[in-house]
Amino acid sequence: MEQFQHISVTDAQEKLNQKDHNARMVDIRDPQSFGRGHVDGAFHLTNDTIVTLMNEVEFEQPVLVMCYHGHSSQGAAQYLINQGYEEVYSVDGGFEGWNKAGLPVEK
């Protein structure tokens, strides 16, 4: 069985900036937290939006999963692997780590 990979917040930002990879960030935090701030261009992944994600993102595209601290994202990342996505990362440190690193946030 395929496994997701771990990625640091700085490596995640670098991967998102590599336009040739067409990586997508998905954020699984609650709607209020997502609304207060998220990574620029992040897709808010919920039970209600999973079908939309699967229609918009090819299985070959890298997918980075972010939660609050980097724990819940691991289960979601494995779920996406099980759905057929080939390159899935759990962002270590989550949104809190992203903020602490001073990386850009969209509000």
Curated annotation (Swiss-Prot):
Entry-linked Pfam families: Rhodanese
Domain called Rhodanese: residue spans: 19-107
Active site: C67
Location relative to the cell: Cytoplasm
Main location: cytoplasm
EC number: 2.8.1.1
Record's catalysed reaction(s): thiosulfate + hydrogen cyanide = thiocyanate + sulfite + 2 H(+); thiosulfate + [thioredoxin]-dithiol = [thioredoxin]-disulfide + hydrogen sulfide + sulfite + 2 H(+)
Annotated SMART domains: RHOD
Protein name: Thiosulfate sulfurtransferase GlpE
Gene that encodes the chain: glpE
